[in-house]
Amino acid sequence: MSNANSFTKEDLIACGLGKLFGPNSPRLPKDNMLMIDRVLKINGDGGEYGKGEIVAELDINPELWFFDCHFAGDPVMPGCLGLDAMWQLVGFFLGWEGAEGKGRALGVGEVKFTGQVLPEAKKVTYKLTIKRKVYRKLVMGIADATMEVDGREIYSAKDLKVGIFTDTTSF
């Protein structure tokens, strides 16, 4: 387990290259698919269930790539990118705890969208609480999460599942 409880954008980029937690740790996506600019807080015993929590942010500006293509004349951040960020953070949490292998999203129990991220927004905040951690042959994290834009909750997800696999050939 890492002793760090916050991470910069540079740290997150290093995670995508296998240089933060080690070469065999789960990696974050690189470049445009990395939907996180910083992790403000991560711990292994906090949150609603006492199994861990993560708070992270993404800075929003009108120049972000997705505003140009989603949609013409009606720019909005795709909801799937916010959901993917939540999965990214569950995988990051498992790597932070020392899991080794490749992270894969395994599903989500429920997702609700009650708002949107427009180019005028300034900041997205992700808040995850870990519900369950499995460290057996299968390593898996299950979390509940919310996403806020400029302090207003607009997405919620229950039972986000991420698995860490040492072999993905049969996945």
UniProtKB/Swiss-Prot annotation:
Stretch forming the signal peptide: none
Pathway involvement of the protein, from the record: Lipid metabolism; fatty acid biosynthesis
GO MF terms, alphabetically ordered: (3R)-hydroxyacyl-[acyl-carrier-protein] dehydratase activity; trans-2-decenoyl-acyl-carrier-protein isomerase activity
Domain of life assignment: Bacteria
The entry's keywords: Cytoplasm, Fatty acid biosynthesis, Fatty acid metabolism, Isomerase, Lipid biosynthesis, Lipid metabolism, Lyase
Membrane-spanning segments: none
E.C. number: 4.2.1.59, 5.3.3.14
Catalysis performed (reactions): a (3R)-hydroxyacyl-[ACP] = a (2E)-enoyl-[ACP] + H2O; (3R)-hydroxydecanoyl-[ACP] = (2E)-decenoyl-[ACP] + H2O; (2E)-decenoyl-[ACP] = (3Z)-decenoyl-[ACP]
Catalytic residues as annotated in Swiss-Prot or TrEMBL: 70
Cellular localization per UniProt: Cytoplasm
Protein's GO biological process: unsaturated fatty acid biosynthetic process
InterPro entries: FabA, FabA_FabZ, HotDog_dom_sf
Main location: cytoplasm
GO cellular component: cytoplasm
HAMAP family tied to this protein: FabA
UniProt subunit comment: Homodimer.
Role: Necessary for the introduction of cis unsaturation into fatty acids. Catalyzes the dehydration of (3R)-3-hydroxydecanoyl-ACP to E-(2)-decenoyl-ACP and then its isomerization to Z-(3)-decenoyl-ACP. Can catalyze the dehydratase reaction for beta-hydroxyacyl-ACPs with saturated chain lengths up to 16:0, being most active on intermediate chain length.
Alphabetized NCBIfam families for the sequence: fabA, PRK05174.1
Protein family (similarity comment): Belongs to the thioester dehydratase family. FabA subfamily.
Protein name per its UniProtKB record: 3-hydroxydecanoyl-[acyl-carrier-protein] dehydratase
Species the sequence originates in: Shewanella halifaxensis (strain HAW-EB4)
Gene label: fabA
